[in-house]
Amino acid sequence: MALSLLKRQGYRIIDQNVRLRSGEIDIIARDQDTLCFIEVKTRASAAQGSAVESISLFKQRKLVKLALTYLKYKKLLEEKARFDVVAVDCQDSGETYIKLIKNAFDLNDSGLMRYR
């Protein structure tokens, strides 16, 4: 579902489920000239809260560290990069909502995601 949405939006998928020593990056893709590190969050029920709400400050910081590790390893530190989120919320009614949030947070943020 997330990959289909990203492709429809013009992203070029580079890699997915990238495992590093300290964690995993869900999707790495290019959106024009920008390298995007994409976190995919799904909530199976509204009782669990929204997918967006589940991305804590701790998770954001972890994603930043993972991305920096990846960029160093691939010698891409000069690349333009950003963090996007694909949020998938399944409602109790059976409906599913999927949302792409570009540039959700960055290295300099105080910890609050832009779309909250």
Protein language model features and the residues they cover:
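Conserved catalytic motifs of the protein kinase core domain
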Residues: 24, 33, 96-97
